[in-house]
């Protein structure tokens, strides 16, 4: 792999930006595709469609069933799965087709994202538009994407053995990796359009940056917490708010032994943790926004801080509504999409503060 050494002379700044702008736009397009992938993946999970395709065929699997024989063969393979035997016994072929298409489009979109990243990457390399540091970053993102494909199948395999549900650990890893890939592409794209200027000596700004970094990490932790909520269907329990069936701290928090299992396997504890992180963000983000008003910031940085506050309010509203209405498909999918938009806002705030 060959990278070009980019000049750092001031007079070449405009020329460098002209080269980097198309790369940034391409990465933003890839971010949009990953966003769509997260939403489709959420719907696939919510409709219990993820176990409908029992084989991993990265190339051959691109072609959908084209004949009745193809459908019969796929349906017969599905008959051998724990999900069919324990959950969907007696399912008709037409019903199977519904869950099949969700999983098929989820996998197909993954292949599209891989090509949408790899082909332009090769093009920019051949055009010598990518210097060595950028090339290493993009190569790392591509490797993460390849790892994500394997992680997806590793997750599906966990539901094809005895338990007709995928492992919540593998599901959370799959979700977290999707957010990490998105974050890497989004950050690199922002760097290309608006490179950092170095940290300001302003102590208030440094404190605000540290605050925003903590918030970004907390949002990501909340996403992982949401993965466990989805993985063990904890959203179907305690469909009350603000209390959990009359308790702020429910008595079933530490039912399981050893105690640490409760954080991953106990529906009560998993939902409580997710609520607790949301409450924490509901307190900290408004404080952060108020602090940002007292620090001299650019217009784009102020906009980013305000969008973070707005997106948190939207996401909390979606989360509460999803809970109270017992996880309806549309709201639950919107809640998953909202998590990525909230994470995007947090990343943008962090990047903007590094440019002040």
Swiss-Prot record:
Single Gene Ontology MF annotation: metal ion binding
Assembly mode: Interacts with CtaB.
Protein name: Heme A synthase
Known EC number: 1.17.99.9
Main location as per UniProt: membrane
Keywords tagged on the record: Cell membrane, Heme biosynthesis, Iron, Membrane, Metal-binding, Oxidoreductase, Transmembrane, Transmembrane helix
General function of this protein: Catalyzes the conversion of heme O to heme A by two successive hydroxylations of the methyl group at C8. The first hydroxylation forms heme I, the second hydroxylation results in an unstable dihydroxymethyl group, which spontaneously dehydrates, resulting in the formyl group of heme A.
Superkingdom as given in the UniProt entry: Bacteria
Family, per entry: Belongs to the COX15/CtaA family. Type 2 subfamily.
InterPro entries with a match to the protein in the record: COX15/CtaA_fam, HemeA_Synthase_type2
Catalytic activity entry: Fe(II)-heme o + 2 A + H2O = Fe(II)-heme a + 2 AH2
GO biological process terms on file: heme A biosynthetic process
Species name: Nitrosospira multiformis (strain ATCC 25196 / NCIMB 11849 / C 71)
